[in-house]
Amino acid sequence: MLDNVLRIATRQSPLALWQAHYVKDALMAKHPGLTVELVPMVTRGDVILDTPLAKVGGKGLFVKELEVALLENRADIAVHSMKDVPVEFPQGLGLVTICEREDPRDAFVSNKYASLDELPAGSIVGTSSLRRQCQLAERRPDLIIRSLRGNVGTRLSKLDNGEYDAIILAVAGLKRLGLESRIRDALPPEVSLPAVGQGAVGIECRLDDTRTRELLAALNHPETALRVTAERAMNTRLEGGCQVPIGSYAELIGGEIWLRALVGAPDGSQMIRGERRGSPQDAEKMGISLAEELLNNGARAILADVYNGDAPV
């Protein structure tokens, strides 16, 4: 980083800019005198909007350009929604800080119906996520699930135009954009298990940039970091790309981590679930062991079909 100036690489969507400003404000509050600049960028994920994410490379499309900016020293940190962060990082880069988690649940959004259970058979539901799709299809095979891309505002416009009867978004994104009133129902994890890291903001930087890492340390939230560590360890062992039918959610309850996970066929015809409880110090180990249980119980075949494009949808 330059003397007392820290540069944040960010996408230009309203939610990405909210996250970047959130980190900027937190850094300036912790380090008075620090100047923080935003470096807005357009990623491939922002440009390719007419194709489902699973077919164009997954959510890593939202991250790559930001990482190139870090490697070329055009920025010092990149701020990500943790559910968009791929399993692996380019050499020399890494995730060094995880901020306090917002509500991780999925949101049911509709202008006509108050809940998922109220949707009549044949209703059209929009989501861009195979994870949400497989859980919806299992619970309500009578619904029509259609792909829905674009930023939050675009997705809400498509709902308001009557293209969908309901859409599923993240509670955290709607709250951060001041759109909490659009949430008709927050879906509990038993109904829609969240994505790995959902609701958490992560910060990536060059691993050899000691000064930046020292500045970021004050923003790390240990409880969130533990929970996300367990979720990401499971996802890493599953070799889960960013656009796969994998859900994972860890809670800290009474000094124990409770980790739940699932892998589902996109059409909801198969769902492999599992859970673990254990000591926070074993967060990573628990994630790996739960992933291995899922793989042995049928997740390996489901994921192979998804990656090969053979999965029923």
From Swiss-Prot:
UniProt name for this protein: Porphobilinogen deaminase
Annotated TM spans: none
Description of how the protein assembles with itself and partners: Monomer.
GO biological process, one term: protoporphyrinogen IX biosynthetic process
Organism expressing this protein natively: Escherichia fergusonii (strain ATCC 35469 / DSM 13698 / CCUG 18766 / IAM 14443 / JCM 21226 / LMG 7866 / NBRC 102419 / NCTC 12128 / CDC 0568-73)
InterPro entries found in the cross-reference section: HemC (IPR000860), Porphobilin_deaminase_cofac_BS (IPR022419), Porphobilin_deaminase_N (IPR022417), Porphobilinogen_deaminase_C (IPR022418), Porphobilinogen_deaminase_C_sf (IPR036803)
Gene assigned in the entry: hemC
Protein task: Tetrapolymerization of the monopyrrole PBG into the hydroxymethylbilane pre-uroporphyrinogen in several discrete steps.
PANTHER family the UniProt entry points to: PORPHOBILINOGEN DEAMINASE
Cofactor: dipyrromethane
EC number: 2.5.1.61
UniProt pathway annotation: Porphyrin-containing compound metabolism; protoporphyrin-IX biosynthesis; coproporphyrinogen-III from 5-aminolevulinate: step 2/4
Cofactor annotation comment: Binds 1 dipyrromethane group covalently.
Entry keyword set: Porphyrin biosynthesis, Transferase
Homology family: Belongs to the HMBS family.
GO cellular component: a single term: cytoplasm
